[in-house]
Amino acid sequence: MEFTGRVWKFGKDIDTDAIIPARYLNTTSPEELAKHCMEDADPSFPQKVRKGDIIVADKNFGCGSSREHAPIAIKAAGVPCVIAKSFARIFFRNAINIGLPIFECPEAVDGIREGDVVQVNADRGVIFNMTTGQTYTAKALPASMQSIIQAGGLMQYVKTRVAEGK
């Protein structure tokens, strides 16, 4: 998998309430969640984000409540992946489980600016900043997690495995 997009940059400790405010948790519609993605971190984000744009954040992205709505909102907003210095553990697992690729790469976060265009090779964990020409390598996810992401999430992964008789 490869993604190319414009960067939206966020700071440290962006919690799940900033990603998708609690006032919208009465819906499970990905399309509705996307309309409010990141609005407490940047109120104009839902109107400005475009399909393919990439979120880059500092450390501890996705901390706070253990809501699966947060990575669902990001994915439904058309953001194909998130790059951060680190992720809260529960967000990390929820992102994998819904098929949202995430990459931990402190060097990339420090070197990428909002508005830069980056290309991410998800299979190799290579992040190329097309604006500056810099290349970074993210921590590789275990093969099992990569398989879940490539399947589109844990549910689809399990359905496929069952259908294959595995």
Curated annotation (Swiss-Prot):
Its EC number is 4.2.1.33. Belongs to the LeuD family. LeuD type 2 subfamily. GO terms for biological process: L-leucine biosynthetic process. Catalyzes the isomerization between 2-isopropylmalate and 3-isopropylmalate, via the formation of 2-isopropylmaleate. CDD domains: IPMI_Swivel. It catalyses: (2R,3S)-3-isopropylmalate = (2S)-2-isopropylmalate. Keywords: Amino-acid biosynthesis, Branched-chain amino acid biosynthesis, Leucine biosynthesis, Lyase. It holds the Pfam family Aconitase_C. It comes from the Bacteria. It comes from Heliobacterium modesticaldum (strain ATCC 51547 / Ice1). Pathway: Amino-acid biosynthesis; L-leucine biosynthesis; L-leucine from 3-methyl-2-oxobutanoate: step 2/4. This is 3-isopropylmalate dehydratase small subunit. HAMAP family: LeuD_type2 (MF_01032). One of its GO terms (molecular function) is 3-isopropylmalate dehydratase activity. Heterodimer of LeuC and LeuD.
